[in-house]
Structure formats: structure tokens, C-alpha cells
Amino acid sequence: LTFEIIILIAIIIASAAYVWHKSSSAKTTPILLDKYDKLIISLLSIGYALFSFIHLGSFQQFKTTWHGEEAGNQLNIQLVSPSKIGHIYYYSGINNGKYHWSDLNNANQEELINDPTANLGYPAHFKWNKIDLPVSDALIQQINLTIDQAPLEIKQLAIFDTNNNYISNLKIKANNSAENLSGLISSSAPQDYENSFSSSTVFDEIFYATTAYQLLHGLDPYVAVHPPLGMILIALGIAIFGMSAFGWRIIPDICSILLVPLIYIFAKRLFKTRRAAIISTILIMSECMHYTLGRLAFLDGIVTLFIILEYYYLYSYLELRSNGAKFSACYRSLWLAGLAFGLGISCKWSALYSAIPIIVILLYGEIVLARPNLRQFLHSLVINLVFFVVLPISIYSLSYLPFIHSQPNENELFKFIWRMLQYMYEFQAYGLQNATHP
């Protein structure tokens, strides 16, 4: 494993060193940004950033966790004053297990409680869940949560009576832990306990935010059907801000913010006018999918940034070739395009769709614009294979290091990645036919 890692890192460093050495004196086309462009970029980027940060997510984290680690583990919630219970809310962390709730009334009769979350068909990771109890005159003195199949983490509880009054006078214990679990109950009703966008995972965040957390802590990742780089980047936000809604959303949001200046610079270079750059930037800023997906812990916003960056450097390459630049003058643009392509496919396979435009652009640049002889064409072919095949594969392979670190019996990176490729293909081709989804 160590040898494989050294080889991959050496490929990236050696290719970068070669490119910067060979193209250090090459003259590139200026982007034509003046002080007014820079001011406009700053205002648009800051404006979009401030708007995107509004209600991005709560910073709230829960310090106490009960771990249901094997079947039969039980969490007992005793009401000091027996009451008529109307609703039970619980915030679950890792939730791959099966479990059931029951209550014990003042006549010592135990009844099962129907929990819709336990029968969803997909795991309710890092979110608030709600149980509505049927109307009854019985006074409940104890609520039990029993593990049928591990694991399950409970991080917070909120119990309300039939008049919607919060009940805080509770005693909590577990049959598998002597730890003080009083932190599972707060003195007043928790914020955002209604499974809101502000506090809980939404849609595919259940998968991506959870996997990011697992990769950060060396746990077996829940999601293996996408390359891990996007989730590693999400984990960076979690490492800084904790496992909170803000923590798992901040990096995708930053990527959506970075797309604003990138679009402006690209449009200015493409159309050569400030008006076109402003219109292009306003269009992306007001685009609903960009705004919505950029504020969620999804992979789409991250991979979009890398794809646009890839096309920016490919256009830079075409511009150089159109102006009669030597092939060596294009090294930096091509290497950076290959780098962006590698980062994109390491986040999500959808970035592979750009491979066909890459081939078309390179063939156009090297055959139509450059009109090389056979030797020159073969030389450019080899360089482009390094930049757009070897370099991206190296980046893709290195992105699996946190994943393989979580697998104690795996010590061969390339074989592991090959098995992951097969698994991902099978899932994308056939595995979604009967899949349940949040």
C-alpha cells in the first residue's frame, strides 16, 4: 500500500514539476480583468455568499450519545411523574439498525409504540424523528427503546404530553452502559426538533453527510456507490464546525460561491465584454438548482465547480493554440484541466461525461489549429495521455485512502479500487431498481 501511494504522489508531483519547468517562459493570453472587474467580482461574490449563508444550518451539536451496539441493548426513559404522552422526538446519529419502542403504563402494562422511522426502508442518519402516540387515558411511567439489530445512536430526546408541554423531569439509564445519560434530555425543549432543514439531514444528505462523518473518523463508510473525494471535502467542514447541519453544508456552499467569480472570469475571457460577464454571473447566481443544491451536502455542486474549471482551462488551451502558441506553452492549461477532470471524477462519475468533449477539443486543437507533423502529433498525444488519463487516475486512486484506511483487512489499493469500480457499476446499472429513498 505504501509503495502504491508513493508512486501515485510521485506521478502528480513529477508531472507538475515538468509542466512548470517547461512552460515557465511561455506567454499566456491575459484574462483582461481591470479594477472594475475585480470590484464587480467582489461585490457579486460577497453578495451571493451572504445570501447563501442565510439559514444554511444550525451549529447545534449533541455531546451525549447512547450507543445501541448489539441486540438486546435497551434505553429506559422513566417519567418521574407519570403522564399522558402525546409525542416522542429523538435525534438519531448512525442509524443502520432495527429497533422498537414500547411504553409501560401505571398499571404495569407494556405496549408497543408504532415508530414510522423504524420502517422507512432507509436509515434515518443524523436527523430528528417523530413518534405520535395514540390518544389514551393511560398514564405512562416508562418508555423503552430496544435494539433488535445494531447499530443505533441516540443523541437527544424530546418528549411532550398530550397538551404539547415539554417533559424534562426524566431519569434515563441503559442496560449496556453505566454512563451518565442525562445529557440526552435538555432542561427546555431543544431547538429545531421538528425535523427541520436547519437541524436534520435532508434527502441524500442522509447518505453523504453520514459517509463524510464516517470517513473523518475512520469508520466503515455507508456510501460506496460514488468516489469518495466529494464526501472527504464535506468531512472537512465537519472537522471544522462539527457534525452539525452547518458543518456538513459549508463546503458545498463554498463551492457554489466560488462558481460565481469563476463564471465571471470565464465569461469575460470568452466574450471579451464586461456586460456578458455580468449577465452570465447573474444567471448562475439566480439559477434555482445552483442555489438549492449548493446549500445541501450533495456532490453535485462540488463536481460542477471542477467541471467548469476544467472547461475554463481547456478554453485557455484553445485560445493559446489559436494564437499560434507552441504546444509547450499549453502545458499549464492542459495540466490544470487534467487536474480539474481528475478531481471531478473523484467526486462523481457524472464528470466522466466531459471526457468526450475533452477528446474533441484536444483533437481540434492539435490537428485543426496546430497542423502538426506526425512526430509533433505523437508527442502531443503522449503528453495529453499523461495529463488526461494518468494524472486523473492517480488523483482518483489517492481519493480512496481514507476509505481503505477504514477497512482493516485491505492493504492493496489498486485491487480495492477495482472491486469498488465493479461494485459501483453494478449498483448504478442494476441496484437502483428496487431501492428505497428518502
Residue ranges and their predicted role:
Residues 164-212, 393-438:
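Aromatic-rich transmembrane-lumenal/periplasmic boundary elements in polytopic membrane proteins
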Residues 313-324, 341, 354-393, 398, ...:
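Perimembrane helix-loop-helix junctions
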Residues 246, 250-271, 309-313:
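Transmembrane-helix motifs of polytopic, lipid-linked glycan transferases
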Residues 248, 252, 289-303, 350:
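Short acidic/glycine- and proline-prone juxtamembrane loop motifs at membrane-interface regions
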Residues 206-216, 222-243, 253-254:
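Short hydrophobic/aromatic helix or loop-helix immediately within or flanking a transmembrane segment
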